[in-house]
């Protein structure tokens, strides 16, 4: 997760986030090359070594400044379309979790199991165990298995919310009366933090998201305990 001096993206913890980081670096390199060319041309025009009193039509130059931007746009569009496709791809999810945003907490419903649903509230600072993160810990975490394709259906009960976990490259608006979906696949166990990313009222800053990914055999034990309780 991020630290106070962190200026870049969080470490990628999912294949989707790795793709997003690749696209970011790819686009940033193109932007750097374009900016370098523009600054060079500005510098060359400010301090010209040659002076031409007459201007003439140069067909080759017009072809270059027409074709070159087209090539740049295509080199950005193709990786972008690939990433968008991966974000919307649905491949036989092993588990479906419905997430509902409320003022100001989240509720989770494991739709494959009729009795498994719970609300997730932020733990107040005065009740926070030592070593836990302020404003990020919740009383009930969203539990998911590793190496499994998980479909998350996202909606809201009252106003607009946004379910976002930066380290796995997931951010989706929660809109009342509408179901949006994201796909999550995580290879390694861990705890991942996020927050509501849409201003939703007075306590917008106090509805964190905590997702814990555990091995499949541990997830099965957690399911049994949760359903029986």
Curated annotation (Swiss-Prot):
Reaction catalyzed: 4 Fe(II)-[cytochrome c] + O2 + 8 H(+)(in) = 4 Fe(III)-[cytochrome c] + 2 H2O + 4 H(+)(out)
Any one of the GO CC terms: mitochondrial inner membrane
Family annotation (InterPro entries): CcO_II, CcO_II-like_C, CcO_II_C, Copper_CuA, Cupredoxin, Cyt_c_oxidase_su2, Cyt_c_oxidase_su2_TM_dom, Cyt_c_oxidase_su2_TM_sf
Binding-site residues, Cu cation A2: 196, 198, 200, 204
Matches recorded under Gene3D superfamilies: 1.10.287.90, Cupredoxins - blue copper proteins
Gene Ontology BP term (one): ATP synthesis coupled electron transport
Membrane topology listed for this record: Multi-pass membrane protein
Cofactor(s), names only, from the UniProt record: Cu cation
Subunit structure of this chain's protein: Component of the cytochrome c oxidase (complex IV, CIV), a multisubunit enzyme composed of 14 subunits. The complex is composed of a catalytic core of 3 subunits MT-CO1, MT-CO2 and MT-CO3, encoded in the mitochondrial DNA, and 11 supernumerary subunits COX4I, COX5A, COX5B, COX6A, COX6B, COX6C, COX7A, COX7B, COX7C, COX8 and NDUFA4, which are encoded in the nuclear genome.
Protein name in UniProt: Cytochrome c oxidase subunit 2
Gene: MT-CO2
């Amino acid at each position: 997760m991020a630290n106070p001096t962190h200026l870049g993206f969080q470490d990628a913890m999912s294949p989707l986030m790795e793709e997003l980081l690749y696209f970011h670096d790819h686009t940033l390199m193109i932007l750097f090359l374009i900016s370098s060319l523009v600054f060079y041309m500005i510098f060359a025009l400010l301090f010209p070594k040659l002076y031409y009193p007459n201007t003439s039509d140069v067909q080759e130059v017009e072809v270059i400044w027409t074709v070159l931007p087209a090539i740049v746009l295509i080199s950005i569009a193709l990786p972008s379309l690939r990433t968008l496709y991966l974000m919307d791809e649905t491949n036989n999810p092993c588990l479906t979790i419905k997430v509902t945003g409320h003022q100001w907490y989240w509720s989770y419903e494991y739709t494959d199991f009729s009795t498994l649903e719970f609300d997730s509230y932020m733990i107040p600072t005065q009740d926070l165990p030592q070593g836990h993160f302020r404003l990020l810990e919740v009383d009930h975490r969203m539990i998911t298995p590793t190496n499994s394709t998980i479909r998350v259906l996202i909606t809201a009960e009252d106003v607009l919310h946004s379910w976002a976990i930066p380290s796995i490259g997931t951010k989706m608006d929660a809109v009342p009366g509408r179901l949006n979906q994201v796909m999550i696949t995580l290879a390694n166990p861990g705890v991942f933090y996020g927050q509501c990313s849409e201003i939703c009222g007075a306590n917008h800053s106090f509805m964190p998201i905590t997702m814990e990914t555990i091995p499949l055999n541990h997830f099965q034990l957690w399911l049994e305990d949760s359903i029986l309780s």
